[in-house]
Amino acid sequence: MAAAVSAKLVKELRDKTGAGMMDCKKALAATEGDANKAVEWLRQKGIASAEKKSGRTAAEGAIGSYIHTGARVGVLVEVNCETDFVARGDMFQSLLRDVSMQVAACPNVEYVTTDEIPNEIREREKAIEMGRDDLEGKPEQMKEKIVEGRIGKRLKELALMEQPFIKDSSITVADLVKQTAGKIGENVKVRRFTRYTLGEGIEVEENDFAAEVASMQNAG
């Protein structure tokens, strides 16, 4: 049994269905490592992938918002689905809230997916990594491989869909979206988001406290 439910099988099932890692492990354990039966098991549980639905147009949906405690961080998120009926449903609205909270909790995230990250940013990150002192003297091929791994990690840090879900770190936001799509039976897509932080971008003048006190004394 342990040999059948290998990490490789879990990864293959996860890639195929979009289900979370723990769900894939449970499915494979329940079906004695049979990948096809595991897919059916996930479908019966309502957590199979929306793979077949992903090509359909998601033009409906809703814009969600989240204001963090203290009103210092605010978020707007657009999530799309196929029908207005689904957009009004509890499951879709729950996803909308969760994604909004996720954006609020991830200040470094700037893009929905890694595919959206511009080439100039990729090239900039590569130039930075190639210049690291710890790579000095290493063979070029090895250096390229190390840099590629570091860049991949860095780009994932910038993408919302790659983040561990704040309520269940065993899955990513992408997994959450796929699971929700599988349950509601429609294509679901996070289209865009905006994160506002109070005072961001405002240059605050730093006063010289000692000079300020001295000037007050002189004025007195």
Swiss-Prot record:
Region span, Involved in Mg(2+) ion dislocation from EF-Tu: 83-86
- What are the annotated GO cellular component locations? cytoplasm
Alphabetized CDD domains for the sequence: UBA_EF-Ts
Cytoplasm: is it a keyword of this entry?
yes
Q: Which InterPro entries match?
A: EF-Ts_dimer_sf, Transl_elong_EFTs/EF1B, Transl_elong_EFTs/EF1B_dimer, Transl_elong_Ts_CS, UBA-like_sf
Checking SUPFAM superfamilies in the record gives: Elongation factor Ts (EF-Ts), dimerisation domain (SSF54713), UBA-like (SSF46934)
**What are the subcellular locations of this protein?**
Cytoplasm
Which PROSITE patterns does the record match to this protein? Answer: EF_TS_1, EF_TS_2
**What would you give as a GO molecular function for this chain, any one?**
translation elongation factor activity
Record bears the keyword Cytoplasm? yes
Keywords carried by this UniProt record? Cytoplasm, Elongation factor, Protein biosynthesis
In terms of one coarse class, where is the protein primarily found?
cytoplasm
The entry's family comment says:
Belongs to the EF-Ts family.
What does it do? Associates with the EF-Tu.GDP complex and induces the exchange of GDP to GTP. It remains bound to the aminoacyl-tRNA.EF-Tu.GTP complex up to the GTP hydrolysis stage on the ribosome.
Q: What's the protein called, per UniProt?
A: Elongation factor Ts
Provide the species name. Answer: Synechococcus sp. (strain CC9605)
